[in-house]
């Protein structure tokens, strides 16, 4: 059979050396293909099984991760504060929180910027000079002011010497408060934000914590004064022997079961008012301003009538007027400083209420005049009341509530009605003072620290809970202890205020770029370093505290030289001025950035300006995304 050139025959598949029939070849090929297919299928099946096992394991891992995410997400969503802002820029979708690292990042971003900390836009800046005058009228008429004024009498001063000290002290207060309030008035930012400028984005947390602690202490203190009003109200109704009728199991020389019960009554009565936002409480403050002056003047007239117009116009200490000039001089200094110590917290957080000023001048002249006048008047009422009561009872009462308690010795219907009515108004006054001066500021500051989980309402309730852990009955057991406590707090706060004022007025010439206050990018003016800390401010802060610290130890019972105590009596001036001077010296040798034209500390320039922040949320978003901190976007907006 011939063989084709290709080596294959058409009728049978044959090679030149071997011949294989077509049928056998097809069968062999088929079997070979089937074998290969079986092997491939087996491998595929094995891979599929292996993949299924791997997917199953992955699914279990993913399911476990999802369970963790769901648990963490549910906890975060349950506790986080809901954003009720009407600005669309404030409702930017947030990345889901899958891990604790995501939570940390979320806490960081909300700390830097949130709706409670944004600058106040024009529609919310409604305070005119009238509102600031009414604010200080309302703030001055409270029992605490009377107690501060009585401190001078107990130090050995007579009534007119004490009153002069009150005028001088609160004039200094007004001056320092105006200095502290300028940044809020012009840039419409709160104290937690303004403190970032001087101390750094992150070290300002410590500064805000100082303010929170003070707010909690004062909240507890005023709550206890309010509870003393409740005591008088109950005594006027049920009799003056409630302390003995109610079994005493506390065994504290400064507290009985009855007094603690009254403290809890007042504390619980304050809680419902913490639920409402600050703008809803304006009616409470308006009512307080309207009725408290009538109660104060009514009490003065009642006391003068009981004393038949006779006043103990000399000093109220045991030595009468027989005190040396040196002792008199230091008594005057301590009486003046008591006013500054009393205001150390409000001086610090003045931007919290001046940021609502309608115009540049709304908060300046009104406060400069109204504050010392209002406090001098109410202090005079306290001085005259204490002096009149001294002619009646021959006892040094430093609180008007102690005088009202003595009125109940003559348990007539008229005395009972008068004591109940005045005590009720004083209790309401303490409630309003606590809300405006402590609960709301504490809530604001706590919001700045942890805004994702704390708003003003929650912060106010936290402040109320902390106040229970403080023992104000020991703090208020005497005027000397009260004054000592005030001085102790001022040691720390005066140094903070000194640094902030020096930074704003001398170093920065009144210039603040508010965009940089809300970012922690490396180029931010107020980051200073990777830790967000201005070390110059920290060192100056420590220098301001150091001279007063020995006297502070002496005030709590440690034996220290008399010179240290005299420095301590001047604690606010010493801490404020030394911290400010130290900061200026450090900045002179180690300049900071963020001042237009690289102005030096010795240059005669003033760069302060009135800033409009109507679209701040949108502008900040653009600044963060496009402008960064170095492209000059802020110059377009501010310079």
Curated annotation (Swiss-Prot):
Pfam families: Transp_cyt_pur (PF02133). High-affinity transport of uridine. This is Uridine permease. GO terms for molecular function: nucleobase transmembrane transporter activity; uridine transmembrane transporter activity. InterPro entries: NCS1, Pur-cyt_permease, Uracil/uridine/allantoin_perm. Keywords: Isopeptide bond, Membrane, Phosphoprotein, Transmembrane, Transmembrane helix, Transport, Ubl conjugation. The keyword Phosphoprotein applies. The modification Phosphoserine is found at residue 56. Residues 1-162, 226-259, 306-367, 436-460, 508-537, 591-639 are cytoplasmic. Its main location: membrane. The lineage of its organism: Eukaryota, Fungi, Dikarya, Ascomycota, Saccharomycotina. Belongs to the purine-cytosine permease (2.A.39) family. It is a multi-pass membrane protein. Residues 1-37 are annotated as: Disordered. There is a cross-link at residue 635 (Glycyl lysine isopeptide (Lys-Gly) (interchain with G-Cter in ubiquitin)). The chain crosses the membrane at residues 163-180, 201-225, 260-276, 284-305, 368-392, 417-435, 461-477, 484-507, 538-562, 573-590. Gene3D superfamilies: Hydantoin permease. One of its GO terms (biological process) is nucleobase transport. The modification Phosphothreonine is found at residue 54. Residues 181-200, 277-283, 393-416, 478-483, 563-572 are extracellular. It comes from Saccharomyces cerevisiae (strain ATCC 204508 / S288c) (Baker's yeast). It is found in: Membrane. The keyword Transport applies. One of its GO terms (cellular component) is cell periphery.
